[in-house]
Amino acid sequence: MTVIGTPFTDNATRVMLLGSGELGREVALELIRYGCEVIAVDRYAHAPAMQVAQHSHVINMLDGTALRAVVEQVKPALIVPEIEAIATDELVKLEAEGYTVVPTARAAQLTMNREGIRCLAAEELSLPTSPYRFADSLAGYQQAVREIGFPCVVKPVMSSSGKGQSTLKNEADILPAWEYAQSGGRAGKGRVIVEGFVDFDYEITLLTVRHKAGSEIKTSYCAPIGHRQENGDYQESWQPQPMSAAALQASREVALAITDALGGLGIFGVELFIKGDQVYFSEVSPRPHDTGLVTLISQTLSEFALHARAILGLPIPTIEQRGASASSVLLIQGQSEAMRYHGLNTALANADTEVRLFGKPDINGSRRLGVALAKADTIDAARDKANTAIAAFKVDL
């Protein structure tokens, strides 16, 4: 049975978030609701989760020595990675010493780069995927493109949110895509994956939760989430995504296989391509997923609430979906350390519409600063409402 201590005492249930962005902030809020003492860690100060957590630390999370130092200082009951760019080798050592890493240190290590998780999915579990090759040199990359053929997609093996990702349509795209991939990786220059283009009808995120049910571990699923990407970065998501019963069942089978292989407790964002009733595995995140922000309005328990319950060993008797819902992101380009947001009154004028501003401390380039959430009678109507809310915003930089 789960026992929660009292914050700011010796018996506090301390949970350390490694990564303190907008997803981490929602997780922190849910954990605090259950009485946890949250420690938010990131590479920069005043990150969104730091603004709500009881404590915060700024470190280079790719530095194993710095990571170990803050863990040994805090001695958390749970270490919860919220991003990929972490010294996962150190997490493996810490777990072996008795610390609990969510869902497991191995899951964090495998999903930190696309090579580990793709090899697990395609080669160990025999899940259907797009054809792929890995390369760590320009010559090897050019050979990989020749073998895969056009069109294809190139991504750094270590990146997220579409950074460094390109679609290649012909020979002229080869060199620019390589250079962009080398600049877009989270851990600097390095290895890339070249993937054959899947001719899919749509793509989904299937949020999959491994949680306690008595003495057993049970797997539960949220309704499928459809989403629209631009340059690998999510722009809109909606739930539920209409799909055939056969495709939904196949999606759940793929999600079950990959999450069982990763193990542990918590929510997983399983990304899948759907073509008719055929399902192709794309990626998995062992944590809440950005497209799952829609669940803040579409479910009685959001993906963040589900994650908090699961990692604390609490029951999840049911996952209730509340009907057609959508999210639309506030993506801004520019430079500023003091943004001002106009249009909130207009954005919230429609019924069943909500907004989350993430409170990010600065912008240098393109950055997601907020999200609009909407419910309606149909998916199209919900998307229109969410997009209308975002269109109301003007951000002064």
UniProtKB/Swiss-Prot annotation:
Pathway: Purine metabolism; IMP biosynthesis via de novo pathway; N(2)-formyl-N(1)-(5-phospho-D-ribosyl)glycinamide from N(1)-(5-phospho-D-ribosyl)glycinamide (formate route): step 1/1. ATP binds at residues 114, 155, 160-165, 195-198, 203. Its EC number is 6.3.1.21. One of its GO terms (biological process) is 'de novo' IMP biosynthetic process. It is an enzyme of class 6 (ligase). GO terms for molecular function: ATP binding; magnesium ion binding; phosphoribosylglycinamide formyltransferase 2 activity; phosphoribosylglycinamide formyltransferase activity. Involved in the de novo purine biosynthesis. Catalyzes the transfer of formate to 5-phospho-ribosyl-glycinamide (GAR), producing 5-phospho-ribosyl-N-formylglycinamide (FGAR). Formate is provided by PurU via hydrolysis of 10-formyl-tetrahydrofolate. This is Formate-dependent phosphoribosylglycinamide formyltransferase. It comes from Alcanivorax borkumensis (strain ATCC 700651 / DSM 11573 / NCIMB 13689 / SK2). The lineage of its organism: Bacteria, Pseudomonadati, Pseudomonadota, Gammaproteobacteria, Oceanospirillales. The gene is purT.
